[in-house]
């Protein structure tokens, strides 16, 4: 445990907040994309599909790197039990709050919008359970994964800490090229695991809880650990905050490969396995792209930025049902995809900000949506 706080990483706070807020244009553009979602526009837009695919290809990989970075930073600052308790509360309480207040009403709304209310009694017990697992966890899945990663990382972080205490500080002798190879192999390993599961017991891949708890956690754990290593080794972090032409070009090529796989791949063949390899290495390269841009443009203290950093989790939690409401009841009345997309941004962001300001004035809601007890002020701690 260290009593000396690490310097404030303003650019990482900002990047994490903007990555979370990117969920708003991501889901609104999903309405107007060629991808089948809960609600879709009458005619899809190719450029909004492209925009949607780009966000989806890297956003959460970078997010989990930052989460791992802050998690290890706080691991060194607090006793183990206190660290685990605070970390789980910060993500677990908002997740459990959002299920009855947000995703359950969202599920009921979709049942009526998609005219599935009459079919519900005909479903088997497992089908009802699995439907509820997908629909109630919904966009909260990353909070569940963070709870799991926090618990799993206890042993890993303890080992890291012991190595730091017993070994002399030394540079992380690994280049971005070596990291790229490692993440490529990790992508292949993940793809192999998925293919084996697909061959042995394909039905389990459609199980919501298995997908969230096992498959998502397996995919994102390398990025979470990479974030912790970036905190341990400043030279490794410097590799990410220093612009790399190779990473930029690699990310561009990987995104083209991602689009081609989306266009020509088949779910019954190797599309998902190929995607896991592509997004694993693209996620690594985009860490460099995003970190280097953020370090140059966002590494400063600003009251406005701090406001959105603090508001980002709440806004993300409430934006999803607002987006679905917009898609179901307002999108059909707007013929232009561009105007509809812009109106969606204004509608969702505007209402989300109003709700955020209201919840700040109600201590119980403020606690439930932040996981922070009202008697404690730990504004320096990170949420994920």
Curated annotation (Swiss-Prot):
Q: What is the purpose of this protein?
A: Necessary for the succinyl substitution of periplasmic glucans. Could catalyze the transfer of succinyl residues from the cytoplasmic side of the membrane to the nascent glucan backbones on the periplasmic side of the membrane.
Q: Could you say which protein family the record assigns here?
A: Belongs to the acyltransferase 3 family. OpgC subfamily.
Task: Please report the name of this protein according to its UniProt entry.
Answer: Glucans biosynthesis protein C
Pathway(s) served: Glycan metabolism; osmoregulated periplasmic glucan (OPG) biosynthesis
This protein's gene is called mdoC
> What GO MF terms are annotated?
acyltransferase activity, transferring groups other than amino-acyl groups; transferase activity, transferring one-carbon groups
Lineage, top-rank taxon, reads Bacteria
Keyword tags: Acyltransferase, Cell membrane, Membrane, Transferase, Transmembrane, Transmembrane helix
Stretches that traverse the bilayer: 17-37, 54-74, 91-111, 140-160, 173-193, 212-232, 240-260, 274-294, 311-331, 338-358
Which InterPro entries does this chain map to? Answer: Acyl_transf_3_dom (IPR002656), Glucan_succinyl_AcylTrfase (IPR050623), Glucans_biosynth_C (IPR023723)
Which organism does this sequence originate in? Salmonella typhi
Give the membrane topology, semicolon-separated if more than one.
Multi-pass membrane protein
Gene Ontology CC terms, in alphabetical order: plasma membrane
As recorded in UniProt, its EC number(s) are 2.1.-.-
């Amino acid at each position: 445990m260290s009593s000396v706080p690490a310097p404030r990483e303003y650019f990482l706070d900002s990047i994490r907040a903007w990555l979370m807020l990117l969920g708003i244009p991501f889901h609104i553009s999903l309405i107007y994309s060629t991808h089948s979602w809960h609600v879709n526009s009458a005619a899809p837009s190719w450029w909004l599909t492209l925009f949607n695919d780009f966000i989806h290809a890297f956003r959460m990989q970078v997010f989990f790197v930052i989460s791992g970075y802050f998690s290890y930073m706080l691991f060194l600052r607090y006793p183990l039990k206190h660290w685990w308790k605070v970390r789980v509360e910060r993500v677990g309480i908002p997740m459990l709050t959002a299920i009855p207040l947000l995703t359950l009403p969202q599920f009921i709304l979709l049942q009526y919008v998609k005219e599935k209310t009459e079919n519900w009694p005909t479903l088997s017990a497992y089908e009802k359970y699995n439907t509820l697992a997908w629909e109630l966890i919904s966009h909260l899945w990353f909070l569940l994964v963070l709870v799991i990663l926090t618990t799993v990382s206890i042993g890993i972080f303890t080992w890291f800490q012991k190595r730091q205490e017993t070994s002399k500080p030394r540079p992380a002798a690994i280049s971005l090229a070596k990291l790229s190879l490692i993440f490529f192999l990790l992508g292949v390993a993940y793809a192999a695991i998925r293919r084996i599961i697909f061959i042995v017991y394909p039905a389990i891949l459609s199980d919501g809880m298995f997908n969230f708890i096992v498959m998502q956690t397996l995919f994102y754990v390398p990025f979470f650990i990479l974030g912790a290593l970036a905190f341990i080794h400043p030279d490794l972090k410097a590799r990410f905050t220093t612009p790399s032409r190779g990473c930029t070009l690699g990310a561009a090529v990987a995104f083209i490969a991602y689009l081609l796989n989306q266009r020509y791949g088949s779910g019954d063949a190797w599309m998902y396995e190929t995607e896991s390899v592509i997004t694993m290495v693209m996620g690594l390269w985009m860490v460099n792209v995003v970190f280097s841009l953020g370090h140059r443009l966002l590494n400063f203290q600003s009251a406005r930025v701090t406001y959105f950093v603090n508001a980002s989790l709440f806004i993300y939690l409430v934006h999803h049902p607002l987006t679905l409401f917009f898609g179901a009841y307002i999108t059909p009345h707007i013929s232009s995809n561009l105007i509809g997309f812009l109106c969606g941004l204004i509608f969702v962001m505007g209402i989300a900000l109003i709700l955020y300001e209201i919840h700040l004035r109600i201590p119980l809601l403020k606690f439930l949506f932040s996981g922070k007890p009202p008697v404690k002020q730990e504004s320096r701690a990170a949420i994920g």
